[in-house]
């Protein structure tokens, strides 16, 4: 039983991806690999599997496996007892519990079985060329001599290749701007910067009260702002406006409408 997958079974295109050219969307191309048949000869086996056959990798940076369909055909009579467990593994991960992408169990009496996995994650093209995926097949309670082939597996995958996998970054937000004007792009950049947690944390930290002279004071209160505070009362000393006591002296007054400094004795 051969399976001919449909892209729509694994991937739902947005309206933008359907209308816009490939260069303007994250989706670049979708390829269906040729089938790969695995003949199971032992009760337990672990073998590499190429999920990216005929997928063009050289022109892209990342590849994602959107879906994998396994079709199994038992090569024994349907009254035979026993079953099989098929697991797909990402061999890059060392933890045995975390490396399993998906597992399926089927009984020999079912004769044929089929299941679909949706890994839905990307790997770099450099990693993909090293074939990071494996299939672990374990036949249980099937009384058959060693060396015979009781099971055949056909594997078909749907993959997507792209040069950009960051979907929430500034680049994607800028591309999404419909009106190509400076103000629109500046607004997107400002909104993105304001949304980053690190910027918020720094801004909040700077606004906190600082300790001066052993007590909490607002540092903004003592910042020199001549245009706002210079005036008739500038020469009058007030204890609450100073950090230290000084004798009265001439104070330079800056006026923005004149453009130069004046001294009032």
UniProtKB/Swiss-Prot annotation:
Free-text function comment from the UniProt entry: Transports viral genome to neighboring plant cells directly through plasmosdesmata, without any budding. The movement protein allows efficient cell to cell propagation, by bypassing the host cell wall barrier. Forms a ribonucleoprotein complex with viral RNA. Binds microtubules and modulates microtubule stability. Can bind double-stranded DNA.
Sorted UniProt keywords: Host cell junction, Host cytoplasm, Host cytoskeleton, RNA-binding, Transport, Viral movement protein
Entry GO terms, CC: host cell cytoplasm; host cell plasmodesma; host cytoskeleton
Ranges where the record places region Disordered: 223-265
Predominant location category: host cell
Subcellular location: Host cytoplasm, Host cytoskeleton; Host cell junction, Host plasmodesma
Biased composition (Basic and acidic residues): 224-249
GO biological process annotation, one example: transport of virus in host, cell to cell
Coiled-coil portions: none
A GO molecular-function descriptor: RNA binding
Keyword Transport: yes
Assigned protein family: Belongs to the tobamovirus movement protein family.
This protein's name: Movement protein
Domain of life per record: Viruses
């Amino acid at each position: 039983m051969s399976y001919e997958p449909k892209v729509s079974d694994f991937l739902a295109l947005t309206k933008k991806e359907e209308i816009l050219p490939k260069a303007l969307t994250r989706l670049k191309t979708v390829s269906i690999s040729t089938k790969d048949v695995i003949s199971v000869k032992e009760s337990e086996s672990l073998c590499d599997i190429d999920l990216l056959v005929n997928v063009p990798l050289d022109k892209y940076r990342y590849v994602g496996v959107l879906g994998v369909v396994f079709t199994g055909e038992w090569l024994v009579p349907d009254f035979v007892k026993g079953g099989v467990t098929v697991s797909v593994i990402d061999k890059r991960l060392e933890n045995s519990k975390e490396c399993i992408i998906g597992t399926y169990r089927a009984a020999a009496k079912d004769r044929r079985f089929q299941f679909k996995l949706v890994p839905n994650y990307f790997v770099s093209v450099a990693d993909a060329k090293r074939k990071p995926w494996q299939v672990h097949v374990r036949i249980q309670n099937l009384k058959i001599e060693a060396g015979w082939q009781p099971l055949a597996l056909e594997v078909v995958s749907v993959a997507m290749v792209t040069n950009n996998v960051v979907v929430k970054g500034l680049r994607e937000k800028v591309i999404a701007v419909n009106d190509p004007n400076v103000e629109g792009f500046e607004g997107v950049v400002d909104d993105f910067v304001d949304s980053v947690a690190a910027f918020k944390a720094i801004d909040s930290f700077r606004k906190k009260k600082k300790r001066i002279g052993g007590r909490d004071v607002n540092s903004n209160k003592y910042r020199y702002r001549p245009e706002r505070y210079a005036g008739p009362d500038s020469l009058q000393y007030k204890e609450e406006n100073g950090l230290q006591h000084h004798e009265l002296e001439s104070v330079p007054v800056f006026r923005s409408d004149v453009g130069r400094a004046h001294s009032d004795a």
